[in-house]
Amino acid sequence: APDPGPGPMGMMGARGPPGPPGPPGAQGHTGHGPPGPPGKSGEDGNNGRPGKPGDRGAPGPQGARGFPGTPGLPGMKGHRGYTGLDGRKGEPGGAGAKGEPGAHGAAGSPGLAGSRGRAGPAGPAGARGADGNAGPAGPAGPLGAAGPPGFPGGPGPKGELGPAGATGPSGAQGSRGEPGPNGAVGPVGPPGNPGNNGLNGAKGAAGTPGVAGAPGFPGPRGGPGPQGPQGAAGQRGLAGDPGTQGVKGDGGPKGEPGNSGPQGPPGPQGEEGKRGPTGELGATGPAGNRSGPLGMPGARGATGAAGPRGPPGDAGRAGESGPAGLRGLPGSPGSSGPPGKEGAAGPAGQDGRGGPPGPTGPRGPSGEAGKPGDKGATGPTGLRGAPGPDGNNGATGATGPAGGPGEKGEQGAAGAPGFQGLPGPAGGAGEAGKPGDRGLPGDQGVSGPAGAKGERGNPGAAGASGPQGPLGPRGPAGAPGTDGGKGEPGAAGAAGGPGHQGPGGMPGERGAAGAPGGKGEKGEAGHRGPDGNAGRDGSRGMPGPAGPPGPTGANGDKGESGSFGPAGPAGARGASGERGEVGPAGAPGFAGPPGADGQTGARGERGPSGGKGESGPAGPAGPAGQSGPPGASGPAGPTGARGDNGPPGLTGFPGAAGRVGAAGPAGLVGPPGSAGPAGKDGPRGLRGDPGPSGPSGDQGMVGPPGPSGEKGPSGPAGXPGXPGTSGPLGLQGFVGLPGARGDRGSPGGAGGVGEPGRVGPAGPAGARGNLGLPGMTGPQGEAGREGNPGNDGPPGRPGAPGFKGDRGNRGESGPGGAAGAVGPAGARGAAGPSGPRGEKGVAGEKGERGLRGHAGLQGMPGPSGPSGDTGSAGPNGPAGPRGPAGPHGPPGKDGRAGGHGTLGSPGARGPPGYVGPAGPPGSPGLPGPPGPAGGGYDVSGYDEYRAAKDYEVDATLKSLNTQLENLLTPEGSRKNPARLSHPEWSSGFYPNQGCSNDALKETCLHAHPGSLARAVVVQGSNDVELRFTFSVLEDGCTRTNKPSRLPLLDLAPLDLGGADQEFGLDLGPVCFK
């Protein structure tokens, strides 16, 4: 139990000798120290037992594309294909022969109202009618029905060429042309005018110290300086007088629980306990928060049995993006970011140490007069003086003046030091400190989003030849060699007996063309092809007979009255009779015969136009007139409905010979031809050299046992006779039936992976790419070697308060020293040498996880780590301020192809193409003519042993050959499609079978339209916005006498997009004089 309370402190005794170490104290309260440094790594523990099998993992990424499988067997014959696509539009044919007049067509539908006709010629003058009485003008009658239309006129002659039409609208922008070759380097221009001031350069390195200047005038008094280093501890002060005993204070409130103390030192290792019995299996616990450490890899399992071959899977999804490429070179430093927001206020610093003593204050007012001192002690009695002579008693004199001050006494002992003065008032703010050294680089920023896939690079230079590959499979049989020279004739052999009829010869050469077959059935109507170009005008056909009148058309506009016809011949002039009185009007007589024309009267004034008369009844159709001159072409009527197919045309002229078709399948072997007559015996030839040993022949059939003859003497070997003339060719056999479908072959094994080729020489350095996106943060590198100590930096700002230190051991009580003045701070000692490395300590128990330490300084960049998995793309950061103009970028990607232009007129026929590369060896040719008949054997009794020739195998082989060729070189037809979609390929031309006439130019990078906040308007030096329109588009320097427009460092073409878009384009400087 604690003592009730200490008594008053006694006087300090003399220093005793140090006591023996005390026993360990009781466990202290939980301390507040910072977490200790991490202990050294313990020795590896024993291997844990293998863990339970983990849950089934998520499906892995899609594997790489497998090697192509072996080609399958030919399938069964497919159904009849669909009608093929329409053929390409043919060139315009020549003018056709003049056709015969067609049959009368059916009446057409009423045409559109014709344009107003020209005035017709005046008709002949009619007979003069009898004069009628002038009746009163009747009211205008109703409009009569339109009269029947006249007969259509014959077609007019072809009109002359019309004037050129107005320029059509501009077509859509064509695709961007290939970049032209670089122009020749122009001559060096004369030096330009001086440019504007450049940007401020980077801060230069520190110069060497200059000569010391003359001492300056004393500056104004500075503000309080930064906190100085802690001074050395002063000597211990004298003991003060014992104070009076204080009153016991009240109990304080209960303190808050302290922070958890640091991990205590590990206790000694206990003895190993006995192994307990195995407990029962507990219930499955909840899933742990952290994944456990990886178990040791288990032993390799036994190979499982091969699973049955699964059906072919569906086409896999497009694989995920590949791993990010290697880390790009460090980008050039980015521009400074915008200033950050003001940080939160830091914690209050510790109280500063006492400032230096303030300046001496003004002199205080005089103090009040002191109190009278105590009466001094009586001094000692002086010696008795010698007796003076007796003076006269004088009168009492006046008081004399005060004596002068005595001499200065010796200096008294120093007084006790006064109490420390109050802190002086705060001084003015000091001058701004010099700029600090450049800070350490900040942590690497978060990786930006993955950049768009770059274009495929230029192909590297060809690598050196790789090592020789393994021997390939045996190639197909070569073409037959040329015939050897004719051997000399051998000696004539004895004539053999006539041989049996030989087996059928191979099919003969193609016979002459047979008589034309009968007319085939009418084929299905093909799809209508695209309209061909207009053919040249045919010769004019004979006018057809007039068709029946069409239905009544709509009323045309009333034509203008025709011009007056030519005057008729003047009639004989009659005698002018006297004018009689007007008699009553008789009934109108019949029209007399036409009288001779009277003289032409003077032209009367034009009367008012009368009302339109009623239309008379339609007269009978007159006889068909001759076909009139062709009228002007009317406007094209609407496209009529599609007519029925016409009767088949006459047989056309034979077309030009077609290209040679692919070899047809071999026909069945024809019946054997009749044996040719035996050739005459040739003269006996000289003995030939022995030939090379031939390949072993097939085993012949077993011959019948002959009677054993006597062994005759071996005669000399006869030379072979000259070949007999070949027999006549057999007829061509019929086409064999397709063979039965073969069984499915067993799958071939996967081919072995070829050896990797040697690394090719490094390609030339590519053009500088665009600035790459910042790479992902690499792993923290190893600590670099210890650097040399740098120069002393300027004093930093006061640091944050440190953690509370550990409690020190109790020091021995020092002797009482007098209080010294604070000494100046000593110079910083040099760093001591590194101590020897201690031995490895015993592994401590695993401590609790410490508090998170401060972020260490950024280490040197480590070696490039392995590429991590691609992280998910972070959100796009805000757009930074516009950086300075970058270097001249490479030419942009090709723009999107423009819309299809109108179909151009067919171009002139191009020159013949270059000779293509030699094609692959063709399929084996047709069998040659049959060779001469060999010597016969008598095999008459063994027909039952002969195998019929397997024609089905031949047909199957031939079909396989054709299908393999179609697989290797697909024709692009529906049965053998050629694939055009290869998004992983790079942009370029993709010819078909090495023929570039129909190559497609495909851009394999597709535009991602977006918006860039980079609309910059440039002003010239005369404060004019540079938004002029320049029309010169030539490569080279252009002279100008307006240097205010130069140099053009940028231009922004306008109206190249929507209303909310503007397109910018950076140019390099324009050369100018």
UniProtKB/Swiss-Prot annotation:
Gene Ontology cellular component annotations, sorted alphabetically: collagen trimer; extracellular matrix; extracellular space
Biased composition (Basic and acidic residues): 519-530, 837-851
Compositionally biased spans, kind Low complexity: 100-148, 178-187, 194-215, 229-239, 296-315, 321-348, 386-399, 411-423, 458-468, 561-575, 584-597, 617-642, 653-680, 708-729, 758-774, 821-836, 857-876, 906-917
Record field: compositional bias (Pro residues): 217-227, 918-932
Superkingdom of the organism of origin: Eukaryota
Domain Fibrillar collagen NC1, first and last residues per copy: 1039-1073
InterPro entries hit by this protein: Collagen, Collagen_superfamily, Fib_collagen_C
Alphabetized GO MF terms: extracellular matrix structural constituent
Biased amino acid composition, Gly residues: 246-255, 424-433, 481-508, 607-616, 745-757, 811-820
PROSITE patterns assigned to the protein according to its UniProt record, in alphabetical order: NC1_FIB
Keywords on record: Collagen, Extracellular matrix, Secreted
Subcellular location: Secreted, Extracellular space, Extracellular matrix
Principal place of residence: secreted
Disordered as annotated region, ranges: 1-939
Family assignment from sequence similarity: Belongs to the fibrillar collagen family.
Family matches, as PANTHER family: COLLAGEN ALPHA (PTHR24023), COLLAGEN TRIPLE HELIX REPEAT (PTHR24023:SF1082)
Annotated protein name in UniProt: Collagen alpha-2(I) chain
Taxonomic source organism: Epinephelus aeneus
Lineage: Eukaryota, Metazoa, Chordata, Craniata, Vertebrata
